[in-house]
Amino acid sequence: MSISIIPYSESLKDSLFGFYSECFPGIGKPFEPDGRHNFYNHIPEHFESFWCLVDDGIVKGSVAIRRFNEDTAELKALYLSEELRGQGYGRKLFDTAISYAREQGYARVVLDSMKSYVNARRLYDSYGFKEIENYNDNTFAEVFMELVF
Protein backbone atom coordinates (compact mmCIF):
# COMPACT_ATOMS: atom_id res chain seq x y z
CA MET A 1 0.00 0.00 0.00
CA SER A 2 1.48 3.33 -1.11
CA ILE A 3 -0.85 6.16 -0.09
CA SER A 4 -0.20 9.80 -0.92
CA ILE A 5 -2.07 13.06 -1.43
CA ILE A 6 -1.32 14.64 -4.79
CA PRO A 7 -2.67 17.56 -6.82
CA TYR A 8 -5.39 16.61 -9.29
CA SER A 9 -4.39 16.10 -12.91
CA GLU A 10 -6.49 15.01 -15.89
CA SER A 11 -4.73 11.63 -15.78
CA LEU A 12 -6.64 10.95 -12.53
CA LYS A 13 -10.08 11.78 -13.94
CA ASP A 14 -11.19 8.21 -14.75
CA SER A 15 -10.03 6.93 -11.37
CA LEU A 16 -11.67 9.88 -9.57
CA PHE A 17 -14.96 9.29 -11.38
CA GLY A 18 -14.77 5.58 -10.55
CA PHE A 19 -14.20 6.44 -6.89
CA TYR A 20 -17.11 8.89 -6.84
CA SER A 21 -19.36 6.33 -8.58
CA GLU A 22 -18.65 3.91 -5.72
CA CYS A 23 -18.56 6.49 -2.90
CA PHE A 24 -21.57 8.71 -3.57
CA PRO A 25 -24.31 6.04 -3.34
CA GLY A 26 -22.96 5.15 0.12
CA ILE A 27 -23.70 8.69 1.27
CA GLY A 28 -27.16 8.74 -0.21
CA LYS A 29 -26.71 10.21 -3.67
CA PRO A 30 -25.72 8.94 -7.11
CA PHE A 31 -22.70 10.44 -8.87
CA GLU A 32 -24.07 12.33 -11.88
CA PRO A 33 -21.13 13.62 -13.97
CA ASP A 34 -23.46 14.54 -16.82
CA GLY A 35 -25.96 16.19 -14.47
CA ARG A 36 -25.66 17.95 -11.14
CA HIS A 37 -21.99 16.97 -10.74
CA ASN A 38 -20.98 18.21 -14.20
CA PHE A 39 -18.47 20.64 -12.66
CA TYR A 40 -16.20 17.66 -11.90
CA ASN A 41 -15.60 17.48 -15.65
CA HIS A 42 -13.91 20.89 -15.33
CA ILE A 43 -11.96 20.66 -12.08
CA PRO A 44 -9.18 23.16 -12.98
CA GLU A 45 -11.77 25.80 -13.90
CA HIS A 46 -14.11 25.13 -10.98
CA PHE A 47 -11.70 24.77 -8.05
CA GLU A 48 -8.71 26.83 -6.96
CA SER A 49 -6.96 23.67 -5.82
CA PHE A 50 -7.99 20.02 -5.80
CA TRP A 51 -6.17 17.05 -4.28
CA CYS A 52 -6.62 13.30 -4.58
CA LEU A 53 -5.61 10.69 -2.06
CA VAL A 54 -4.24 7.83 -4.12
CA ASP A 55 -3.37 4.29 -3.12
CA ASP A 56 -1.08 2.65 -5.67
CA GLY A 57 -2.37 5.05 -8.33
CA ILE A 58 -6.07 4.53 -7.54
CA VAL A 59 -8.08 7.47 -6.17
CA LYS A 60 -9.45 6.71 -2.71
CA GLY A 61 -10.19 10.22 -1.48
CA SER A 62 -10.42 13.88 -2.41
CA VAL A 63 -10.64 17.42 -1.09
CA ALA A 64 -10.77 20.82 -2.74
CA ILE A 65 -10.66 24.54 -2.10
CA ARG A 66 -12.77 26.94 -4.09
CA ARG A 67 -12.46 30.71 -3.84
CA PHE A 68 -15.75 31.99 -2.43
CA ASN A 69 -14.74 35.65 -2.29
CA GLU A 70 -11.63 37.72 -1.62
CA ASP A 71 -11.45 36.77 2.08
CA THR A 72 -13.17 33.38 2.05
CA ALA A 73 -12.26 29.93 0.78
CA GLU A 74 -14.85 27.17 0.53
CA LEU A 75 -13.92 23.59 1.39
CA LYS A 76 -15.43 21.15 -1.10
CA ALA A 77 -15.27 17.52 -2.22
CA LEU A 78 -14.05 15.96 1.04
CA TYR A 79 -14.60 12.26 0.41
CA LEU A 80 -12.73 9.19 1.62
CA SER A 81 -13.24 5.52 0.82
CA GLU A 82 -14.89 3.46 3.52
CA GLU A 83 -11.86 1.15 3.82
CA LEU A 84 -9.53 4.03 4.77
CA ARG A 85 -11.76 5.75 7.31
CA GLY A 86 -10.63 5.85 10.92
CA GLN A 87 -6.94 5.74 9.97
CA GLY A 88 -6.20 9.47 9.89
CA TYR A 89 -6.44 9.91 6.12
CA GLY A 90 -9.51 12.13 6.30
CA ARG A 91 -7.64 14.42 8.69
CA LYS A 92 -4.64 14.48 6.32
CA LEU A 93 -6.87 15.50 3.41
CA PHE A 94 -8.53 18.13 5.59
CA ASP A 95 -5.14 19.44 6.79
CA THR A 96 -4.00 19.77 3.18
CA ALA A 97 -6.95 21.98 2.27
CA ILE A 98 -7.00 24.08 5.45
CA SER A 99 -3.24 24.67 5.30
CA TYR A 100 -3.54 25.74 1.68
CA ALA A 101 -6.32 28.22 2.48
CA ARG A 102 -4.31 29.69 5.34
CA GLU A 103 -1.16 29.96 3.17
CA GLN A 104 -3.15 31.75 0.46
CA GLY A 105 -4.14 34.43 2.97
CA TYR A 106 -7.83 33.68 3.31
CA ALA A 107 -9.38 35.00 6.53
CA ARG A 108 -11.84 32.13 6.81
CA VAL A 109 -12.98 28.82 5.35
CA VAL A 110 -16.64 27.92 4.93
CA LEU A 111 -18.26 24.60 4.13
CA ASP A 112 -21.66 23.02 3.73
CA SER A 113 -22.57 19.51 4.77
CA MET A 114 -25.35 17.13 5.73
CA LYS A 115 -26.55 16.34 9.26
CA SER A 116 -26.05 12.63 8.58
CA TYR A 117 -22.29 13.09 8.02
CA VAL A 118 -21.54 12.57 11.71
CA ASN A 119 -17.86 11.63 11.33
CA ALA A 120 -17.19 14.64 9.11
CA ARG A 121 -18.94 16.87 11.65
CA ARG A 122 -16.65 15.59 14.41
CA LEU A 123 -13.67 16.46 12.22
CA TYR A 124 -14.99 19.97 11.54
CA ASP A 125 -15.69 20.55 15.22
CA SER A 126 -12.20 19.37 16.18
CA TYR A 127 -10.70 22.11 13.99
CA GLY A 128 -12.88 24.79 15.56
CA PHE A 129 -15.50 25.19 12.83
CA LYS A 130 -18.70 26.84 14.07
CA GLU A 131 -22.20 26.71 12.60
CA ILE A 132 -23.32 29.73 10.61
CA GLU A 133 -26.36 30.74 8.59
CA ASN A 134 -26.80 29.40 5.07
CA TYR A 135 -24.25 31.18 2.89
CA ASN A 136 -24.89 29.57 -0.50
CA ASP A 137 -27.56 28.15 -2.78
CA ASN A 138 -26.82 24.45 -2.21
CA THR A 139 -30.32 23.03 -1.74
CA PHE A 140 -28.85 19.66 -0.68
CA ALA A 141 -26.89 21.06 2.30
CA GLU A 142 -28.32 21.15 5.82
CA VAL A 143 -25.35 22.42 7.84
CA PHE A 144 -23.19 25.48 7.15
CA MET A 145 -19.96 26.13 9.03
CA GLU A 146 -16.96 28.44 9.12
CA LEU A 147 -13.45 28.53 10.52
CA VAL A 148 -11.97 31.97 11.08
CA PHE A 149 -8.17 32.15 11.08
Located regions from the model:
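Acetyl-CoA-dependent GNAT
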Residues: 3, 7-77, 81-83, 94-95, ...
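Conserved active-site alpha-helix within GNAT-family acetyltransferase domains
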Residues: 91, 103, 115-133, 138-141
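Conserved amphipathic alpha-helical interaction elements at protein-protein interfaces in regulatory
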Residues: 26, 49, 86, 99-103, ...
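Conserved GNAT acetyl-CoA-binding A-motif
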Residues: 101-112
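A generic structural signal for beta-strand entry/edge sites
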Residues: 70-72, 108, 142
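Loop/helix-junction capping segments adjacent to catalytic residues or to phosphate/diphosphate-binding pockets
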Residues: 14, 87, 118
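Conserved acetyl-CoA-binding loop-helix of GNAT-fold acetyltransferases
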Residues: 80, 86-99, 122, 126
